[in-house]
């Protein structure tokens, strides 16, 4: 990560690359990919979202299913199965050790997951313990507040962080040190405060974090644009301050 502090006024938040890996590919050679794959090979396949429903991992599985259906319309739809736990740690451990209870499984991950793997937070498994299949796209961070929040702009939020002795509660689908946590930490640091003292609540996916924001349990959501747009499309009410 760069040591240069981006200015929130520039709406500069690091993009998150979303990737899929398939541990089953290395464990079950009979599962054929590419041009040689058949509908029978694909039967029973699923995409595992290592979170609760509604977040970026859920959306990644949806995109994967749509992509496969477009190029292989005869294949059975790719099912989505949710496996929360450690915001990806449980899914990675089971994929790396062949304990996914599925011979035909893709697992949605992000560059935030890779950061946790590099930091050793997903167990002792190396990054090449699984087979990385594809990158689906990029996503951008957002800063959002409750629709009745007094903050209408990011500048107002930053001023409140500078002036208030009462710390705000941030929340997102990421643990301490994750990319979602880093977004909140950048805001707090830019306001002249110590990020180590900020209040941050980790959720099992962005969907759960957005529910907490809408319910008034956190003050600021620092997640990703795709999960925010998906939540709004399903009726969630919140105010975006920055992308």
What are these regions (language model features)?
Residues 102-104, 166-167, 236-238:
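Loop/turn elements at helix/coil->beta-strand transitions in domains of secreted/extracellular proteins
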Residues 104-107, 124-143, 169-171:
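A structural signal for short loop-to-beta-strand junctions that line the ligand-binding cleft
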Residues 176-183:
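Secondary-structure junction motif
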Residues 33-127, 176, 192-230:
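N-terminal (or domain-start) structured segment
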Residues 48-52, 140-150:
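A bilobed periplasmic-binding-protein/Venus flytrap-type ligand-binding module shared by bacterial periplasmic
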């Amino acid at each position: 990560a760069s040591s240069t502090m981006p200015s929130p006024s520039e709406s500069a938040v690091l993009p998150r690359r979303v990737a899929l890996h398939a541990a089953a590919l290395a464990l079950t050679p009979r599962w054929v990919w590419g041009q040689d794959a058949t509908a029978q090979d694909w039967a029973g396949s699923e995409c595992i979202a290592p979170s609760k429903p509604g977040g970026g991992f859920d959306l990644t599985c949806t995109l994967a299913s749509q992509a496969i259906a477009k190029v292989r319309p005869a294949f059975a739809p790719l099912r989505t199965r949710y496996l929360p736990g450690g915001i990806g740690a449980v899914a990675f451990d089971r994929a790396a050790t062949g304990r996914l209870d599925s011979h035909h499984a893709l697992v949605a991950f992000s560059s935030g997951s890779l950061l946790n793997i590099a930091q050793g937070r997903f167990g002792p498994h190396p990054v090449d313990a699984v087979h990385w299949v594809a990158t689906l796209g990029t996503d951008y961070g957002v800063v959002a507040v409750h629709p009745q929040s007094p903050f209408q702009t990011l500048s107002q939020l930053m001023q409140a962080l500078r002036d208030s002795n009462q710390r705000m509660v941030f929340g997102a689908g990421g643990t301490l040190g994750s990319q979602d946590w880093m977004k909140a930490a950048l805001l707090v640091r830019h306001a002249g405060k110590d990020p180590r003292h900020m209040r941050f609540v980790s959720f099992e996916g962005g969907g759960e974090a957005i529910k907490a924001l809408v319910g008034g349990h956190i003050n600021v959501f620092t997640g990703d644009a795709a999960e925010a747009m998906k939540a709004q499309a399903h009726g969630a009410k919140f105010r975006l301050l920055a992308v």
